Amino acid sequence: MAKPLGTTGEFFRRRDEWRKHPMLSNQMRHALPGIGIGVGAFCVYLVGEQIYSKLMAPSSQSSHQKQPAPSH
C-alpha cells in the first residue's frame, strides 16, 4: 500500500502538474519531427564551412607573389 502523501507531497504534485499538460507532452515533439536532427546537421555544416574556408583561404604571402604583370 502506498504511503499517504501529506502536505509536502501534495505541494510537489500540484507544482509539477504543468509538466503533464497535453500541450507540453508529445504534441510539441510530434509537431516538428526531425527539427533536432536538422538543427544539428546545420550546425555541423556551418562548422565544416568555417574550417574549409580557413584551410582554403590564400595566405597573405602567396597573394603578393602571384600578381599578374602590368600590361603596358
Swiss-Prot record:
Tell me what this protein is called: NADH dehydrogenase [ubiquinone] 1 beta subcomplex subunit 3-A
Kindly give the membrane topology term recorded for this protein.
Single-pass membrane protein
Q: Which Pfam families match?
A: NDUF_B12 (PF08122)
What quaternary structure, including any partners, is listed in this protein's UniProt entry? Complex I is composed of at least 49 different subunits.
An individual GO BP term: electron transport chain
Q: Keyword check for Hydrolase, yes or no.
A: no
| Recorded superkingdom | Eukaryota
Q: Keyword set for this entry?
A: Electron transport, Membrane, Mitochondrion, Mitochondrion inner membrane, Respiratory chain, Transmembrane, Transmembrane helix, Transport
What this chain does, per the entry, is described as: Accessory subunit of the mitochondrial membrane respiratory chain NADH dehydrogenase (Complex I), that is believed not to be involved in catalysis. Complex I functions in the transfer of electrons from NADH to the respiratory chain. The immediate electron acceptor for the enzyme is believed to be ubiquinone.
**Gene Ontology terms: cellular component:** mitochondrial inner membrane; mitochondrion
What family is it from? Belongs to the complex I NDUFB3 subunit family.
Where is the protein localized?
Mitochondrion inner membrane
The residues that cross the membrane are 31-48
Upper lineage is: Eukaryota, Viridiplantae, Streptophyta, Embryophyta, Tracheophyta
Q: Report whether Nucleotide-binding shows up as a keyword of the record.
A: no
